[in-house]
UniProtKB/Swiss-Prot annotation:
Residues 49-121 form a coiled coil. The gene is CEP126. Residues 730-744 have a biased composition (Basic and acidic residues). GO terms for biological process: cilium assembly; cytoplasmic microtubule organization; mitotic spindle organization; non-motile cilium assembly. Depletion of CEP126 by siRNA results in an increase in cytokinesis aberrant cells. Keywords: Cell projection, Cilium biogenesis/degradation, Coiled coil, Cytoplasm, Cytoskeleton. This is Centrosomal protein of 126 kDa.
Amino acid sequence: MLAGRPGTRSAVGELGTESSDNLDRAPLGPRESGGHHRPGSYLDMKIHLEKNLEEERQILLQQQKICRNRARKYFVESNRRKKAFEEKRKEQEEKEHQIREQILQQRKQKFEEVTEKFQRAHVPLSQRRKAVSRKPVPPLEEALKQIQESNLKSEVNLPFSRRPTINWRAIDSALPSALSKNDHKHQKQLLSKINCEKEMNENMRATLATSKNVFQLKLEETQKLLEDQHLSNLQKFCDEVNQITNSETLSSIDSLEATEHEEIYLTLNKEHSTSIQRNTISLKPANMQSTNLSCFDEDKLAFSKTQHINNWLTNLDASNTQNVTAFSDILSKSNVLPSWEYFNSKEQNPSPLNGTVERATNTANNSVPFVSSPPMFVLDKKCEKTSETSTMRTTDSTSGAFKRERPLVTESPTFKFSKSQSTSDSLTQEVATFPDQEKYSELNQENGTTSIPTSCVPVATPLVLPSNIQSARPSAKNSIHIKEIDAVQCSDKLDELKDGKEEEIKYFNCNKEELPLFSDSFQDAYIPHNPDSKDEKQKLAETSSLSNVTSNYDFVGQHKKMKYNIHERNGVRFLKSILKKESKYEHGYLKALIINQSFKFGNQKAAAIRDSIELTKEKGAEIPKTIKKLRWFDETSNIENNAENSHSLKNKTGTTQQHSQQFHIQSGAGSNIISVSTCAVNSADTKKSREDSISENVTTLGGSGADHMPLNCFIPSGYNFAKHAWPASKKEESKIPVHDDSKTKQGKPQRGRAKIIRKPGSAKVQSGFICTNRKGAVIQPQSASKVNIFTQAQGKLIIPCPPPQSTSNIRSGKNIQVSQCQPVTPENPQNIITHNSFNSKHVLPTEHSLNQWNQESSSPLSNACSDLVTVIPSLPSYCSSECQTFAKINHSNGTQAVARQDATLYCTQRSPVCEESYPSVTLRTAEEESVPLWKRGPNVLHQNKRATGSTVMRRKRIAETKRRNILEQKRQNPGSVGQKYSEQINNFGQSVLLSSSEPKQTTRGTSYIEEVSDSTSEFLMAENLVKASVPEDEILTVLNSKQIQKSNLPLNKTQQFNICTLSAEEQKILESLNDLSERLHYIQESICKNPSIKNTLQIIPLLEKREDRTSSCRDKR
């Protein structure tokens, strides 16, 4: 069997030989030793051993084959695992690399966005490039995976039970058998497919999770955005409501949108007036009804939402407001007399006013309300004009009440509005609103007249009456008890308008009464009358042709309580300051709209609207810049808000007649205007004697508007009045009753009360004015028939003497017109009265008619003009010792106001007068104050008669010097502002002529004037020029020319005085001053030639002048 194999044969042979040798040897030994030999047993053993060896060899070979197969399997498995591990590592590295790239890309994109935002921060949002969020483009492998995922979406969308389940354990257990049976390539493909499926499933799950998360995030973001938008809308709505209820001016909600304020409760039609006449137009009710909607044709006016808001606030409590009367019903009544007030301004005014006020009166005892519906009508210039207005006025002999009814289309707030009237050919129109009703009720109850309380409750009064030249002139007729009526005043500083602490003092302010506030110049003149006797009433009855309708009013205390309760009940929140101050306004009184001076009505768009009462929003180039407030060192703590600045428009002058204007005093900074009414008090003699003299000349002279005014102010527009440095004491303020009955006034003369004394004279001669203050009375008679005219101030009595005037020498020269003013700065701002003209705390601008001093010259009234010097009471004792002099000059209008330490305030203004009208002023000592006024008058008259001869020669000398100075100044620089200013200074210095018996007062007065005009006036002139938007170069040239011109002043002033009366020391001082002035003139010329040293040397002349003055004062002492 094994013979065929060589290996076996050799093995067996070797084994057989070996065994045979061994066998042979083994038995040979015994055989040799004598044993027996057996050959058969030897062969059998040999065969048996070979068989066993062959079996063992086969087993070993089989085991070797199995081990080789196992090693091969393990090797393959190890190689597969290595490859799988390598692939996984590569995939992880790729994933990490992709993640890194993605993060870096995001960071790079964010960095680019931030840099772009930073670089384009100056570019507006509309022009910026919007960053578009673009999805990153996936690489090719990810795109293939996404395609495979999209193919397997059907499998993913199947339910979980129907999905093909893969038993991974069975696959792993079957792997060894499969590997042993199948080829290596088949195994590799199977494993790759399984891994691919695993990854795809994992990716699908991840994408589902991420898509769910993204969807949830987007949903949450949209919800948050919607919530934020809703909240923002709610917040905006709440802010608008709060702005409506809490705004300082209820009708200025769209204050930044100036175009929406063309109509605010009064339609105003701009018409250029080429004539001076202000005529009263009387229309029939049919004509009124035919034009009642004409206002809506102007600029397509529509009632703004401010009107609806105010109407809503007005109608919060319908039970406390009067029933709405249909406008047609009111017009259809027989007792309604509609009259139209036609307001035209002069040609210089760009915004004339056409206001329509309908008046309804009843002759019976029933109180028919006056219906005022300005928004409904526009008066056309072509309407009928009447020359007589006395025939159109009806009176209510017993009682009447004015109220403002709601118009036809929209309901405007109720408002106590007085009738406004104008006389034919009158140059000033008047609109008045009634002040506090309680004082009327007190007056009515004292006089026993019937009073009817009204339940009209004005919640807000956005009535706006911007007027150009208007004033209120209520007058008396028959036995009607006339009450004191103040005009509507304009004030932006309403925190000053506080009620007085005493019940007697009823201030007319916006806290107590809802009033239209006028920011334009609004001319006021009042003739309040309180007749006491039958004779006075009879004389008043004689002048009934000029009297106007006046009704009695009784608004008792329940009116104020009712307003307060309505506001508290309806939850109206009251005004607070935008400047985060404490609210100084009482509850229950809302304020009206403040309209800036540049607010234009009618066909013009609104140029600017005052956004707030305390915070002014300037819009447009025509609005003046913020006026800097001068703070004097002797101001008390609460007097910062009283820097007066008068703004009034220039009136057209007729052939010979001067027309009055309102004197405005500006309070605080930011063009805050407090229009100050002229002063008048209940006096029976005033109306009686006044109307006796002018009742026949109203229509012929065309000056009825001015005839009724006891006090007129010739103060031009832009006239700046310096701030008073002397405050009134609190005790005096608290003791001054504003309105009092004439009977109680006789028994209890009040300090600080203003009285009017009028004497019968010609129609153009104004009556005298007495204002009693702390230490005496300021008496300014304005009668041509009286020469004993004197003005008393603290320590001085200034008497203007009549100049000799000739009608042939009249030219358009310059005249100085002076207004009397009293200190307006009390210590307590709550006691400031801006709407009361019956108090010494109030500025009382009085117009002095310049045709008074005619007795010597006996020239016609039209040509008779003179100069007056007004003296203002001196400072109180606690601040008069260290008060600095000050002045505020407005050069653009040719006016000047100079206040001195010796308590004399000179307000000068130029107007066409006679060339030779140069009055002389005689100063009286303070000892004459102890003499009673009725004794002092004749004495002054007698002294004036004695001093007449000596003043004539002096006047001639001064006239010659003044002419020479004016001619020299005109030759040098006739058109410059500085020239006009120096001319004013020269004329002003020459106008103050002093008697030869008081040489010390002469030199002292002129030195003070010169002091004021040097330092402070330069600063004020520069400030005015800056405010007028003059370039810096022109300002510097004006200042230099003014300083050069002022060098001539000492020479001019030394010529004015009688040198013989001066002592030798004074003559030396004057000579030294002349030398110094020449040196200063040389320095000024050098500075003008070398502008580089202008800034360093410009202060030197002022310092040198001050040093010279101080040295001269020391030498005098």
